[in-house]
C-alpha cells in the first residue's frame, strides 16, 4: 500500500478529558516529564476527577507505624476529641460541609496522601513542611488521636469522611499545609523531609501514613476549616476567586530555598520545591490540585474543592533569611472571560493563566503563540480556552517531535523546550495517566475523507471501464485522501467497511493484519480485518500523539466477493464506507465460466497465510456422456500439495456457480475422492485421476479441487485436461484449460509456517547513573519505543506501561533496531557498562536525534533483554539579593537592608526573556529549574535610586554586580548575583520633599482600596442567580404531565372499555352468547347442549328463553343483550355500554334508545334475532333464502356470521374482544364464539339452532313470533342486510340488530353477534360504537358491511385490533384497572355492572374515562349513542369508542380484565370460561374475586339482574361481560382457556373448526356464509350444529365443563346459576328455567331443529350454498377444504397455503370470490357479494368471509376461522386446536361441511355434507392441496432453473489466460488419426471375415 504523509488536524475545541488510568494493558500517552505546574494547570482548567486510585501499593522502608510523641496517625478514620459528626458528613472547625463534601480544616490531607508537619515523607510519599500552620491557625500538638481515629480540634468527621484534628494523617496520603491533593496525587508542602524519612522528635510518619500539621483531609474530600464556599468556587484569604480558578495564598514560600552543602537531596529522593512528586502521588503546596478546584484556608470550598493555605512551608526545610530569601508573590486574581469576550480579553486571560503555570518564559512564549495563532479564538468559551491552554502546554511539554525520522513536510514541526521545573517521574506518570483515556474511541467522525474512488486497478482493453474479470487477474482499486483531527489519540479507531459484494485484497485472501503508514514508513495505524463483518478496524499508534495536522492518502486493492457475486455478466453494486464516507460504484462481473466447455477452471484465491493457491475445476459441465475419462493437471513454478486434491460428484447442477466458488459442504455434491485416488508425480508437479469408473459416461458432472504451493519467483501456471486416454502421445482430448497467477506489488509474499517470537524488556530510572538495573530502581512509564528492521524500516510501535515494560510480538529470526525516545529532562544512562545484557543499559545516543538505539537479535527464542536506562537531568537555581547601599561603597554591609519590589529579568545568552520576578520584602529573588548554560540577569533600576559601584570587592558574594550580569551555570547553583542602589542626591529635591506632603496624595493610594472592589467578587453571589435555576421549577410544567391525565383520555379507552363492555355487552350478549359462548356453552349446548341449555345461555339465547328472556328478558335478553335490561344489563353490559353507554346507557338509554331501538328491535330483534337466528335458522332458511338476506343477513348475518364469521371475527371481535381477548375469546369466544360462531353458529346453533331451534322450537314458537321477528330479523336481517344498510340505521337497528344483536340475541348467536355483535355488540357497543361503526358499518356494513361489519367486524376486528387496542387500552385497562378496581366491582358489576363495571369503568374510566368519556366519546358516545349520535357517537365511538370498543378496551377492560386475565384464570374459568368466564370469570376472577362475588353478584347481580332482567343474561351478559371481560378475558385467556376453550376451542376449535371449519366450513359454510348467516344458521345448522354439536360436544367438553365449571365456579356461586348461571346468567335462571325448558327444547329442538335447520340451513345453505356452492364454490369448499383447513391446520400452513390456497382456492372461492380476496373486497364484495348476494356473498362473504376469512376476514372469518383463526389464533392454536382438529376432523367434517358447504351448499348437503362430507372432504382436500402445491413448487423451481440457465450467454468470452493454442494442430491430427484408425480396424475385420468365409 502507498501511504502519503499525513497531516494531523486538531480540533481546538475538543476538551481533553483526562481520566486516570492505572491499567498496564493500555498504552499510555507520554507527556514527557511534565511538571507539577502543568498538573496543577490540568486541575485549574479541566478539573480532573479523581476516579481511580494508584494501582500499586506504595513501598516505604519505614515501619508500618511510627508513633509520635503527641499525636498518633490513624489508619482510616479520625476520631474527634469533642463532638462527633453525623454519618457521611465532615465537621469543620467553624461551619459544617455538606454531605459527601470534604470539609477542609485549613490544611487537610486527603485519603491516601501522607503529610507531616516536621516529619519526613515515606519513600513514595511527599512530606509536608515543618511549619504548616496557616495564617489563621497555629499547629498544635496537644490532642492525640486514637488508634483508628485522629482527633480534631473541634468537630469530628464521620465514618465516611475523616475530619482530622489538628495534625492527624490519613491512610496513604500526603497532605500539604495549604491544601489537599486529590486521590491520586500527594500533597507536597514546600519543605518536604529529607532522604527517605526524617523522624522528628515530635512526630513520625508511618509507612503509608503521614501526619498532617494541623488539619487532615477526609477520605475523598477535604474538611473546610472556617467558612465553606459554594460548590465549585475557590476562595482566597481575602477575596474569593472565580469558578475554576485557584486562589493563591498571599505569601507563598519559595520553591526551593537556598540549599546548603549540608542539605543536599538524598540518593533515594529528590526533594522537590513547590511541587514535589512521589511515584504515584504528589501533594502540591502552592498550587494544589483537588478533585475539581483549589481553595484557600480562610474561605474553604465545599464539595470537590480544596482549600489552599496562605503561607505554605518550603520544600526541603525551613530556610533562614541568611540561607535563602523567599519570594513575595502578589496575590493576583485571574482575569475572567466568557465566550462573548473580545479576542484581546481572551488573550489577556490566557496570558495570565499561562503565567500561573510557573514555567519558563520560552515555554510561555510558545504556548502564548499557539493560543494567539488559534483561528477560532474568537469563538472559544472559557472552558474551551482552558482546554486549549492545557493542550498547548502538553504539546509543548511533549518534545517528542523526532523519532529518528525526518519531520514530515505536511506536519507542523514542534519546538524543543527547556523546562524550568525540576520534573520528577511521578507527575509525569500521573499526568500521562490523567491525560490518557482507558480505551480508544471510534473517531470515524473526526476523519475527513476526500477524493474517494473505486476504479479498475488494471484494465483489459477488451471490455469497458465498469466491467471486471476477476479470473484474468483484474482487481478494483480503492483510493482516498484523509485528514486527521488533532484530537485523535493513540488507541482511537476508525473503520473501513466493505459491502455485500466486495472484499479487500485481490486474488489473495484478505490479510488479517494490515498497517496504515506514512510516506516515510512510520506506522500511523494498525488494522485488523474481520471477515464476519467484512470490516477492517484500524487502531492509531502513538504517531498521532507526536504530530499535528496529519494528512495522507492510501490505495487499497479489492475484488468481488465470490460467495455473493456468483453469476457472470451481472451488474453488482460495490460499496465501501471509509470512516463515515461511502464510495459506491456498479460493476459488471464476468468470471468467464463457459458452460459448454468440458473443462473449466479458475484459481479461486491465493492463501498467503498457508502459502498456497486454491484451484477449482469443473468437468463435463455440459453433461455429455464421456467414456474412459481421465483427468490430469500440470503446474509450473509450483507443486501440488498431496492430499489437497479432492473429487466431488455433482448431484445438483445449481452448485456449479460461475464464480468457481461452489458449496462443497452441502447436499449438492458428494465427495468421491476415495473412489478415484489421485496419483502424484515424484516432484508433485503433476496429478492424475482415472475417472474411467465414474458416472461421466452417464453424463455426470464432477468438480476437482486442488492446492498448489508456489516454489519459485515466477508466475505459477497450471493446466487442466480431461482426456479419453491418459496417453498424451495418442490422447483424444476432450477438454483443456490453463490458469496463470501473477503478482501485483509483491502482494503474494508468503508468510509460510515460520515460527514467531517476542522481543522487549524494560526502561528504568537509573537513579545512581551507573547504567545497571538495581533492585530499588523502578521503571519509567510512557516512553515511546519503535522497532525497526535491519534496513531501518519501522515495523511496530509501543509505549512503556506503568512498570516501564514494553514488548513486540510475532517476530521472526533476525536482527532488529530498537529506538527509545529520550523523555524530556532525562539523560541516557551509560550503555553496556558490564557484560550482562539482562541488567545493563543497551541504548546508545544516536547522533543529534532525540533517541537511543539498541540492537536486538532473535535466534529461535524470545529476546526479552533489550532495555535502557535514563536518569533525571539535574536542575539548578540562580539568585541573591538587591540592597540599599547607604554608604555607596558597592559592598553589602550588615546594617544595609534589602530593597523590595525590584524587577529582575532572566534571559538566555541571546537576550530572550525566560523569566521575570521581583524581590521580596528582604530584597531577595530567585530563579529555579535551570539547566547548565549561559544566562543574563537584568536588574531594573528602581525609580529615585542610583546604581552603586560594581565589582568593588574581591568577594563575589558581597559586592554589587551591576544592572546586567552574564552568568554561566555548570552543574551548580549560583546565589551570588546581586546588586545595590543608593538614594539620589538632590537637596533641591529635598525641598521638593515638602511636596512630600503631596504624598498625602499617596493617600490616594488608599484608592488602591478600590481593590475593595474585589468585593465585587461578591458578585460571585450573583451565582445566586443560580436561583434562576428555580426556573427549573418550570419543571412544574411537569405538571403538564398532569396532562398525562390526558391519559385519563386513555380512559376514553376506558370508555372504549365502556364500549369494550359494550363489546362485553355484545359479548356480554355475545358473551351472553359467549355464554352463548357459553355457547361455548352452546358448545355447552353440546355440553349441556345442556349448556345448550347453558345455551340456555343459548337459552340466554335460549332466547328461546331469551324469548323466555325474550319474553321476560327477551327484552331482557334482547335487552339483556339488547339493552333493555340486557342493556340495562346489557347496559349493564350496555352498561358496559351502559358505561360507555352507561353514559352510553344514558346514551345507552339513549342507546337504549338506540338500544331502545335495539330494544325495540331487541325485543323485536331480540326475538327477531334470537328468532333471527331462530330466523337465522328460519332466516337461515330465510337466510338461506334470506341468505340473499342471509347473505344480506349473510352479510348482516353473513357478516354477522360473516361477522359471525366476522363474528368469528366479531368473535374475532368477540374475539375482538375476544380478540385480543376475543381471539382469546375467539378462542374463548371464538371457540366459544367459534362455538360462539359455531356456536354463534353454535349460537346460531346453540342459540340459533339450539335456541334458534330452541327458539325455533321454543322461540321458534315464541320466536315463531321471534320468527316473525325472525322474519323481522330475517327481514331484520334481511333488513339487516337490507337494513344492513337500513340497519346501517339498523345500526340502531344494527344495534337493533346489534340489538339485532338482538341478533346479539339471535345473533346472540350472531354472537348476538356476540360477534358482530360481539362486535356487533362490541360493535353494539363497538357497534354501539361498532354500530357506531357497525352502525356506520353496521349500516351498510351492518349487513353488507356486515361484511363491512365483517369489516365492521373487521372493524370488529378493528375492534379485534381494537382488542389489540383493547389491550392497548389494556391501558385503558389501566383505567380499566382503575376500573379494574371498579371493575373489580365493575366486574362484580362487570357482571352486574359488567357494564356497571363498564360504568365503574365507564365511571371509573368514565371518570377517568369520564374524561375519556368526558372526552369520550363514551359520553359523547353516550350522547352519540343517546342519539343516533350513538351512531354519531358511533362515529365518535366508532372513532374513539369504536376503537374504544375497538379498544375492545372492552377487551381491554376485558383485558382490564386483565382481570380477564385474572379471568384468564377465570379463563381457566375461561374454559369455565365459557361460563367460567362466563363469567365468574373473570371478573369473577378478575374482579374475580370481587366479581367472583361480583359474579356471584354478577350472577348474583347477573342473577339479580339475571333474575331481574334476564340480565341474568344481561348479567349473563354481565357475566357475558364477565365474559366479555371474562371472555374478553376469558377470551384473552379464554383463548388461553379459550384455548382451553381452544380446547374448548379445540372444541371451540371444533367449533373453531366449526368456526374454522364452521367458518372454514362456515367458511365453506361461511362460504355458505349465508350459511354463515344461515351459517349462523348454516353453521348453526349445518356444520355449526353438527359441529356445534360436534363442537357442542367439543364444547360439550370444554364448555360443559367450562360452563359447568365456569359457572360452576362463578356460578359455583353462579352454578346455582352456573348453568343456571349459564342459565342463571343466561336465563337469569329464570330463563334458565325457561331456558332449561328452552334447553330441553333448545337442545332437543336445537338439535332436531338444528338438524332440520341444518337441513333447513343445509338447504339454506344449499341455497346459500347453492350460491355458496357456486361460490363456495366447491373451490370455496375445496378451499373450504383448503380452509378445511385441515389446511386451516394445514392452515396452519396449509392455510398459509390453504389460506393462500384457501384464498387461492378460497380464491377459487376467492376466485369464486377472488372475491374472497374481493373479500377483503369480499367484504365489500361481501356486500357486493351480499349481492352475490347472500349466496355468492354469503358464500363469497362466507367465502369472502371464509376467504375474507381465509383472508382478511378469513382472518376475520379466519377469525371466524380467526375464531378458527381465533382458533386460528387460538386457532392457530385453536386451529392447532382446531386442528386439534379433532375438530379439524370434525372440521374435516366441518370441512366436509366446508366442502359439504361448498358441496353442502352445493348439495345443500349441508346436512348430508355436514356429515358425509365431513369426512370425505375434510381431509382429502386438505391433502390434495398440500401435495399439489408441493409438486407445483418443485416443478416451478425446476422451470425457473431451466429458464435461468437457458439464457446464459457470453457476448465477450474471457480469454483463457495462459492458454496454449498450439495444441490445436494436435487436436486435428489426433482426430484424423482416430478416424483413420477406425477405417483400418473396419478393413481388418472385413478381411478377417472374408478369410473365415
Curated annotation (Swiss-Prot):
Residues 286-302, 981-1836 have a biased composition (Acidic residues). One of its GO terms (biological process) is cell adhesion. Keywords: Cell wall, Peptidoglycan-anchor, Repeat, Secreted, Signal. Residues 1-54 form the signal peptide. It is found in: Secreted, Cell wall. Responsible for collagen binding by S.saprophyticus. Residues 756-874, 875-984 form the CNA-B domain. Residues 53-333, 941-1867 are annotated as: Disordered. Residues 324-755 are annotated as: Ligand binding A region. Pfam families: Big_8 (PF17961), Gram_pos_anchor (PF00746), SdrD_B (PF17210), SdrG_C_C (PF10425), YSIRK_signal (PF04650). A motif (LPXTG sorting signal) lies at residues 1854-1858. It is a peptidoglycan-anchor. Residues 1858-1893 form a propeptide. It comes from Staphylococcus saprophyticus. Sequence repeats lie at residues 72-83, 84-95, 96-107, 108-119, 120-131, 132-143, 144-155, 156-167, 168-179, 180-191, 192-203, 204-215, 216-227, 228-239, 240-251, 252-263, 264-275, 276-287, 288-299, 300-311, 312-323. PANTHER family: TOL-PAL SYSTEM PROTEIN TOLA (PTHR34403:SF8). Belongs to the serine-aspartate repeat-containing protein (SDr) family. The amino acid composition of the SD repeat region is different from that of other SD repeats, containing a very high percentage of alanine residues. This is Serine-aspartate repeat-containing protein I. The modification Pentaglycyl murein peptidoglycan amidated threonine is found at residue 1857. InterPro entries: Adhesin_Fg-bd_dom_2, Adhesion_dom_sf, Fibrogen-bd_dom1, Ig-like_fold, LPXTG_anchor, SDr-like, Sdr_B, SDR_Ig.
Amino acid at each position: 500500500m502507498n501511504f502519503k504523509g499525513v497531516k494531523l488536524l486538531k480540533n481546538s475545541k475538543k476538551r481533553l478529558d483526562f481520566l486516570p488510568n492505572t491499567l498496564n494493558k493500555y498504552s499510555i500517552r507520554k507527556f514527557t516529564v511534565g511538571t507539577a505546574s502543568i498538573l496543577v494547570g490540568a486541575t485549574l482548567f479541566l478539573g480532573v476527577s479523581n476516579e481511580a486510585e494508584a494501582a500499586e501499593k506504595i513501598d516505604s522502608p519505614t515501619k508500618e507505624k511510627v508513633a509520635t510523641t503527641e499525636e498518633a496517625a490513624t489508619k482510616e478514620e479520625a476520631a474527634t476529641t469533642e463532638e462527633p459528626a453525623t454519618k457521611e458528613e465532615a465537621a469543620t472547625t467553624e461551619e459544617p460541609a455538606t454531605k459527601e463534601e470534604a470539609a477542609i480544616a485549613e490544611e487537610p490531607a486527603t485519603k491516601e496522601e501522607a503529610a507531616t508537619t516536621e516529619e519526613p515523607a515515606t519513600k513514595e510519599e511527599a512530606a509536608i513542611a515543618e511549619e504548616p500552620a496557616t495564617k489563621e491557625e497555629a499547629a498544635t500538638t496537644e490532642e492525640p488521636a486514637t488508634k483508628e481515629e485522629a482527633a480534631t480540634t473541634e468537630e469530628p468527621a464521620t465514618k465516611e469522611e475523616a475530619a482530622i484534628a489538628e495534625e492527624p494523617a490519613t491512610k496513604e496520603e500526603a497532605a500539604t499545609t495549604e491544601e489537599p491533593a486529590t486521590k491520586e496525587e500527594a500533597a507536597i508542602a514546600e519543605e518536604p523531609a529529607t532522604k527517605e524519612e526524617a523522624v522528628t522528635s515530635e512526630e513520625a510518619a508511618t509507612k503509608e501514613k503521614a501526619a498532617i500539621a494541623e488539619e487532615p483531609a477526609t477520605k475523598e474530600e477535604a474538611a473546610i476549616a472556617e467558612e465553606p464556599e459554594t460548590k465549585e468556587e475557590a476562595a482566597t484569604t481575602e477575596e474569593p476567586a472565580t469558578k475554576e480558578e485557584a486562589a493563591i495564598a498571599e505569601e507563598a514560600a519559595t520553591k526551593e530555598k537556598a540549599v546548603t552543602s549540608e542539605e543536599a537531596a538524598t540518593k533515594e529522593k529528590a526533594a522537590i520545591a513547590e511541587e514535589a512528586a512521589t511515584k504515584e502521588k504528589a501533594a502540591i503546596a502552592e498550587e494544589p490540585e483537588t478533585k475539581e478546584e483549589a481553595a484557600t484556608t480562610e474561605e474553604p470550598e465545599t464539595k470537590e474543592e480544596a482549600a489552599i493555605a496562605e503561607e505554605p512551608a518550603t520544600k526541603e526545610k525551613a530556610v533562614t533569611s541568611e540561607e535563602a530569601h523567599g519570594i513575595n508573590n502578589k496575590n493576583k486574581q485571574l482575569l475572567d472571560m466568557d465566550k462573548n469576550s473580545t479576542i484581546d480579553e481572551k488573550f489577556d486571560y490566557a496570558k495570565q493563566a499561562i503565567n500561573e503555570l510557573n514555567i519558563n518564559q520560552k515555554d510561555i512564549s510558545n504556548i502564548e503563540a499557539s493560543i494567539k495563532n488559534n483561528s477560532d479564538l474568537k469563538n472559544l468559551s472559557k472552558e474551551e480556552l482552558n482546554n486549549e491552554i492545557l493542550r498547548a502546554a502538553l504539546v509543548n511539554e511533549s518534545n517528542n517531535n523526532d523519532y529518528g525520522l525526518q519531520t514530515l513536510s505536511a506536519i507542523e514541526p514542534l519546538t524543543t523546550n527547556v523546562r524550568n521545573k525540576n520534573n520528577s517521574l511521578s507527575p509525569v506518570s500521573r499526568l500521562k495517566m490523567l491525560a490518557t483515556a482507558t480505551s480508544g474511541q471510534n473517531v470515524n467522525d473526526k476523519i475527513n475523507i476526500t477524493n474517494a474512488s473505486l476504479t479498475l486497478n488494471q484494465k483489459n482493453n477488451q471490455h469497458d471501464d465498469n466491467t471486471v474479470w476477476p479470473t484474468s487477474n483484474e482487481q478494483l482499486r480503492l483510493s482516498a485522501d484523509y485528514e486527521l483531527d488533532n484530537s485523535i489519540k493513540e488507541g482511537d479507531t476508525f473503520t473501513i467497511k466493505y459491502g455485500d459484494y466486495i472484499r479487500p485484497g485481490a486474488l489473495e485472501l484478505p490479510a488479517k493484519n494490515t498497517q496504515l503508514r506514512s510516506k516515510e514508513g512510520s506506522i500511523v495505524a494498525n488494522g485488523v480485518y474481520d471477515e464476519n463483518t467484512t470490516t477492517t478496524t484500524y487502531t492509531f499508534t502513538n504517531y498521532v500523539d507526536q504530530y499535528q495536522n496529519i494528512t495522507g492518502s492510501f490505495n487499497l486493492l479489492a475484488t468481488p466477493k465470490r460467495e455473493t457475486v456468483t453469476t457472470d455478466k451481472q451488474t453488482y453494486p460495490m460499496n465501501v464506507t471509509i470512516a463515515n464516507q461511502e464510495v459506491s460504484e456498479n460493476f459488471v462481473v464476468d468470471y468467464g465460466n463457459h458452460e459448454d466447455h468440458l473443462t473449466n477452471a479458475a484459481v479461486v484465491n491465493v492463501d498467503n497465510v498457508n502459502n498456497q493457491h486454491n484451484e477449482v475445476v469443473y468437468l463435463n459441465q455440459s453433461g455429455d456422456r464421456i467414456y474412459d475419462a481421465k483427468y490430469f493437471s500440470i503446474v509450473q513454478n509450483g507443486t501440488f500439495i498431496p492430499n489437497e486434491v479432492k473429487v466431488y460428484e455433482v448431484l445438483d447442477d445449481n452448485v456449479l456457480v460461475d464464480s468457481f466458488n461452489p458449496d462443497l459442504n452441502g447436499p449438492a455434491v458428494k465427495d468421491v475422492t476415495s473412489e478415484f485416488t489421485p496419483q502424484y508425480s515424484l516432484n508433485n508437479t503433476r496429478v492424475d485421476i482415472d475417472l474411467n469408473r465414474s458416472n461421466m459416461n452417464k453424463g455426470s458432472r464432477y468438480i476437482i479441487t486442488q492446492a498448489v504451493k508456489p516454489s519459485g519467483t515466477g508466475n505459477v501456471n497450471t493446466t487442466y485436461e480431461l482426456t479419453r486416454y491418459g496417453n498424451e502421445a495418442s490422447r483424444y482430448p476432450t477438454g483443456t484449460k490453463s490458469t496463470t497467477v501473477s503478482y501485483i506489488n509483491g502482494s503474494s509474499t508468503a508468510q509460510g509456517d515460520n515460527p514467531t517470537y517476542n522481543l522487549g524488556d524494560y526502561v528504568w530510572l537509573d537513579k545512581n547513573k551507573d547504567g545497571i538495573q538495581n533492585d530499588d530502581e523502578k521503571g519509567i512509564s510512557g516512553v515511546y519505543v519503535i522497532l525497526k528492521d535491519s534496513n531501518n524500516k519501522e515495523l511496530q510501535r509501543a509505549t512503556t506501561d506503568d512498570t516501564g515494560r514494553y514488548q513486540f510480538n510475532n517476530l521472526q529470526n533476525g536482527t532488529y533496531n530498537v529506538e527509545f525516545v529520550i523523555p524530556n529532562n532525562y539523560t541516557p544512562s551509560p550503555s553496556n557498562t558490564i557484560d550482562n545484557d539482562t541488567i545493563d543499559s543497551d541504548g546508545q545516543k544516536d547522533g543529534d536525534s532525540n533517541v537511543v538505539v539498541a540492537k536486538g537479535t532473535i535466534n529461535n527464542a524470545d529476546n526479552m533483554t533489550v532495555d535502557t536506562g535514563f536518569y533525571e537531568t539535574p536542575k539548578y537555581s540562580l539568585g541573591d539579593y538587591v540592597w540599599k547601599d547607604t554608604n555607596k561603597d558597592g559592598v553589602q554591609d550588615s546594617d544595609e537592608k534589602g530593597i523590595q519590589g525590584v524587577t529582575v529579568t532572566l534571559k538566555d545568552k541571546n537576550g530572550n526573556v525566560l523569566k521575570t520576578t521581583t524581590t521580596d520584602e528582604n530584597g531577595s529573588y530567585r530563579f529555579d529549574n535551570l539547566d547548565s548554560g549561559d544566562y543574563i540577569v537584568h536588574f531594573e533600576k528602581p525609580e529615585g535610586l542610583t546604581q552603586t559601584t560594581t565589582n568593588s570587592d574581591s568577594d563575589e558574594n558581597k559586592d554589587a554586580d551591576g544592572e546586567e550580569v552574564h552568568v554561566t551555570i555548570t552543574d551548580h547553583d549560583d546565589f551570588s548575583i546581586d546588586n545595590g542602589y543608593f538614594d539620589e542626591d538632590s537637596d533641591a529635591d529635598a525641598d521638593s520633599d515638602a511636596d512630600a506632603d503631596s504624598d498625602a496624595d499617596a493617600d490616594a493610594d488608599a484608592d488602591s482600596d478600590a481593590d475593595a472592589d474585589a468585593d465585587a467578587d461578591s458578585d460571585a453571589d450573583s451565582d445566586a442567580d443560580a436561583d434562576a435555576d428555580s426556573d427549573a421549577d418550570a419543571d412544574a410544567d411537569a405538571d403538564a404531565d398532569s396532562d398525562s391525565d390526558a391519559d385519563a383520555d386513555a380512559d376514553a379507552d376506558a370508555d372504549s372499555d365502556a364500549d369494550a363492555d359494550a363489546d362485553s355487552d355484545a359479548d356480554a350478549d355475545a358473551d351472553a352468547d359467549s355464554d352463548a359462548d357459553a355457547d361455548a356453552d352452546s358448545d355447552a349446548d353440546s355440553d349441556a347442549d345442556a349448556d345448550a341449555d347453558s345455551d340456555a345461555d343459548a337459552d340466554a339465547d335460549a332466547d328461546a328463553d331469551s324469548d323466555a328472556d325474550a319474553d321476560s328478558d327477551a327484552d331482557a335478553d334482547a335487552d339483556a343483550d339488547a339493552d333493555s335490561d340486557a342493556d340495562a344489563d346489557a347496559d349493564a353490559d350496555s352498561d358496559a355500554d351502559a358505561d360507555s353507554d352507561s353514559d352510553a346507557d344514558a346514551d345507552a338509554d339513549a342507546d337504549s334508545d338506540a338500544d331502545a331501538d335495539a330494544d325495540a328491535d331487541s325485543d323485536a330483534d331480540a326475538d327477531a334475532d334470537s328468532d333471527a337466528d331462530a330466523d337465522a335458522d328460519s332466516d337461515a332458511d330465510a337466510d338461506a333464502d334470506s341468505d340473499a338476506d342471509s347473505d344480506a343477513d349473510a352479510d348482516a348475518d353473513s357478516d354477522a356470521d360473516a361477522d359471525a364469521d366476522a363474528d368469528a371475527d366479531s368473535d374475532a371481535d368477540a374475539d375482538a374482544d375476544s380478540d385480543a381477548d376475543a381471539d382469546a375469546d375467539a378462542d374463548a369466544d371464538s371457540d366459544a364464539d367459534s362455538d360462539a360462531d359455531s356456536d354463534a353458529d353454535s349460537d346460531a346453533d346453540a342459540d340459533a339452532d339450539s335456541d334458534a331451534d330452541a327458539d325455533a322450537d321454543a322461540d321458534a314458537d315464541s320466536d315463531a313470533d321471534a320468527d316473525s321477528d325472525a322474519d323481522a330479523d330475517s327481514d331484520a336481517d334481511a333488513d339487516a342486510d337490507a337494513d344492513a344498510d337500513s340497519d346501517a340505521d339498523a345500526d340502531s337497528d344494527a344495534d337493533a340488530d346489534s340489538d339485532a344483536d338482538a341478533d346479539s340475541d339471535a345473533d346472540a348467536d350472531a354472537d348476538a353477534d356476540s360477534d358482530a355483535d360481539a362486535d356487533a355488540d362490541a360493535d353494539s357497543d363497538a357497534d354501539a360504537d361498532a354500530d357506531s361503526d357497525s352502525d356506520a358499518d353496521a349500516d351498510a356494513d351492518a349487513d353488507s358491511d356486515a361484511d363491512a361489519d365483517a369489516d365492521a367486524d373487521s372493524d370488529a376486528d378493528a375492534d379485534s385490533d381494537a382488542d389489540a387496542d383493547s389491550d392497548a387500552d389494556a391501558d385503558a385497562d389501566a383505567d380499566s384497572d382503575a376500573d379494574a378496581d371498579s371493575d373489580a366491582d365493575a366486574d362484580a358489576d362487570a357482571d352486574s355492572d359488567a357494564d356497571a363495571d363498564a360504568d365503574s369503568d365507564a365511571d371509573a374510566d368514565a371518570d377517568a374515562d369520564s374524561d375519556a368519556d368526558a372526552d369520550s366519546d363514551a359520553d359523547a358516545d353516550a350522547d352519540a349513542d343517546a342519539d343516533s349520535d350513538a351512531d354519531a357517537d358511533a362515529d365518535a365511538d366508532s372513532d374513539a369508542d369504536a376503537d374504544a370498543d375497538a379498544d375492545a378496551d372492552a377487551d381491554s377492560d376485558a383485558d382490564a380484565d386483565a382481570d380477564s386475565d385474572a379471568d384468564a384464570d377465570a379463563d381457566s374459568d375461561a374454559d369455565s370460561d365459557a361460563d367460567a368466564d362466563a363469567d365468574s370469570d373473570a371478573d369473577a376472577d378478575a374482579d374475580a374475586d370481587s366479581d367472583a362475588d361480583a359474579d356471584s353478584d354478577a350472577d348474583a347481580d347477573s342473577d339479580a339482574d339475571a333474575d331481574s332482567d334476564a340480565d341474568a343474561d344481561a348479567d349473563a351478559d354481565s357475566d357475558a361481560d364477565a365474559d366479555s371481560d371474562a371472555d374478553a378475558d376469558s377470551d384473552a385467556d379464554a383463548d388461553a382457556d379459550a384455548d382451553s376453550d381452544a380446547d374448548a376451542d379445540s372444541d371451540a376449535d371444533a367449533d373453531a373448526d366449526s368456526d374454522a371449519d364452521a367458518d372454514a366450513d362456515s367458511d365453506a359454510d361461511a362460504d355458505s356464509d349465508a350459511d354463515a348467516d344461515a351459517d349462523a344458521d348454516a353453521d348453526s345448522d349445518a356444520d355449526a350444529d353438527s359441529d356445534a354439536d360436534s363442537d357442542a360436544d367439543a364444547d360439550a367438553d370444554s364448555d360443559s365443563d367450562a360452563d359447568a365449571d365456569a359457572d360452576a365456579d362463578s356460578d359455583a356461586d353462579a352454578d346455582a346459576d352456573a348453568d343456571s348461571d349459564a342459565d342463571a346468567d343466561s336465563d337469569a335462571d329464570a330463563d334458565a328455567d325457561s331456558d332449561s325448558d328452552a334447553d330441553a327444547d333448545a337442545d332437543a329442538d336445537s338439535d332436531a331443529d338444528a338438524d332440520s335447520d341444518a337441513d333447513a340451513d343445509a338447504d339454506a345453505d344449499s341455497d346459500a350454498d347453492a350460491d355458496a356452492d357456486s361460490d363456495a364454490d366447491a373451490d370455496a369448499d375445496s378451499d373450504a377444504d383448503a380452509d378445511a383447513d385441515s389446511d386451516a391446520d394445514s392452515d396452519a400452513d396449509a392455510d398459509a397455503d390453504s389460506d393462500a390456497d384457501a384464498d387461492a382456492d378460497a380464491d377459487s372461492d376467492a376466485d369464486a370470490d377472488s372475491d374472497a380476496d374481493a373479500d377483503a373486497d369480499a367484504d365489500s364484495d361481501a356486500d357486493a357479494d351480499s349481492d352475490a348476494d347472500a349466496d355468492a356473498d354469503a358464500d363469497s362473504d362466507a367465502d369472502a368471509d371464509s376467504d375474507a376469512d381465509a383472508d382478511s376476514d378469513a382472518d376475520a372469518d379466519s377469525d371466524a376461522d380467526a375464531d378458527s383463526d381465533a382458533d386460528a389464533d387460538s386457532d392457530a392454536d385453536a386451529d392447532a386446536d382446531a386442528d386439534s382438529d379433532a375438530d379439524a376432523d370434525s372440521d374435516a367434517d366441518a370441512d366436509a361441511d366446508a366442502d359439504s358447504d361448498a358441496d353442502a351448499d352445493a348439495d345443500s348437503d349441508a346436512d348430508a355434507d355436514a356429515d358425509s362430507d365431513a369426512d370425505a372432504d375434510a381431509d382429502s382436500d386438505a391433502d390434495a392441496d398440500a401435495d399439489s402445491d408441493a409438486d407445483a413448487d418443485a416443478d416451478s423451481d425446476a422451470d425457473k432453473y431451466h429458464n435461468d440457465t437457458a439464457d446464459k450467454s457470453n457476448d465477450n468470452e474471457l480469454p483463457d489466460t495462459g492458454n496454449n493454442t498450439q495444441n490445436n494442430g494436435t487436436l486435428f491430427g489426433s482426430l484424423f488419426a482416430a478416424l483413420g484408425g477406425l477405417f483400418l480396424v473396419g478393413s481388418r475385420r472385413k478381411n478377417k471375415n472374408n478369410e473365415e468365409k
